[in-house]
A protein has these predicted regions:
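Terminal beta-strand-rich extracellular "head" domains
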Residues: 94, 118-180, 186-187
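Short, surface-exposed beta-strand/turn "edge" patches of beta-sheet domains
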Residues: 175-209
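Beta-strand-rich, repetitive solenoid scaffolds
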Residues: 1-7, 12-17, 21-28, 32-46, ...
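Hydrophobic residues positioned within well-ordered beta-strands of beta-sheet architectures
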Residues: 114, 136, 216-220
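Extracellular structured ligand-interaction cores
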Residues: 55, 109, 215-219
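Surface-exposed ligand/attachment interfaces on beta-rich extracellular proteins
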Residues: 1-3, 65-75, 83-108, 117-146, ...
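Short, solvent-exposed secondary-structure boundary motifs
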Residues: 1-8, 21-26, 41, 83-100, ...
Length: 226
């Protein structure tokens, strides 16, 4: 092994171990990083690689760009996973959310995938019949982009259990849609007569003291603002 220096390369470590060329240990004599003899890969054997500054990450700038279009960034600067609480809401309404409410999310870069279930758990009050129903509580604000890359992305929606039905069989939602610059989803269905996609309304919810009602399962992927 040798330690050298050149004006161009700076400090040079040259290892010649039978197993590893470079081994870094902590004060407890635990190996935390190593490079195999003759190898070029760096292995972190204990702990994690921690980005100490927000917005920094792994830069894939050495890779080729797209075959069509133009790349704007090759920096992977975020990963996160966790839970969130989706709840029904409608302007002016008081809605008691049910016991079958919960969700999970995963964020890779600015791409967010959420899944969840939500329901109502009691009688509702206030509200206006024609006002849209929302699922609120998204973990990240939807990107406010109007150029096409994030124009109201849609996801899957299912009301699996008929025992927890909605008020009108024909108006049960089948799609969730993210809304630019917001932290909620809209629900919608295809009208049986006109075939148009219509936002689910407050009067589409089944008003019942039973728990749960209006049970729904959903997932959606969208681009986050940050």
């Amino acid at each position: 092994a040798a330690i050298g220096y050149t004006a161009a390369e700076g400090l040079i470590l040259t290892g010649q171990g039978s197993t590893d060329d470079v081994t870094i240990k902590n004060d407890a004599d635990t190996t935390v990083l190593q490079v195999a003899t003759g190898g070029v890969d760096v292995e972190i054997t204990a702990g994690n690689l921690i980005m100490g500054t927000s917005g920094k990450g792994i830069d894939f700038g050495a890779t080729a760009g797209p075959t069509a279009g133009s790349g704007t960034s090759e920096l992977l600067d975020d990963y996160e996973e966790g839970t969130w609480t989706p709840v029904y809401a409608s302007t002016g309404a008081t809605i008691t959310n049910g016991s079958t409410t919960g969700g999970a999310y995963r964020k890779i870069g600015s791409l967010v995938t959420v899944q969840g279930s939500t329901s109502t758990g009691g009688a509702m009050s206030g509200g206006t019949a024609g006002n849209p129903v929302r699922i609120e509580g998204l973990p990240f604000t939807v990107d406010d982009d109007t150029s096409g890359e994030n124009m109201r992305p849609t996801g899957n929606f299912d009301t699996w259990n008929s025992s927890y039905q909605w008020a009108e069989d024909g108006d049960q939602p089948s799609v969730v849609s993210a809304v630019n610059n917001q932290v909620y989803l809209y629900l919608s269905y295809r009208d049986a007569v006109d075939k148009y996609r219509i936002d689910t309304r407050f009067d589409d919810l089944q008003d019942s003291s039973s728990n749960p009602r209006n049970l729904a399962y959903f997932s959606i992927t969208y681009i986050a603002a940050t």
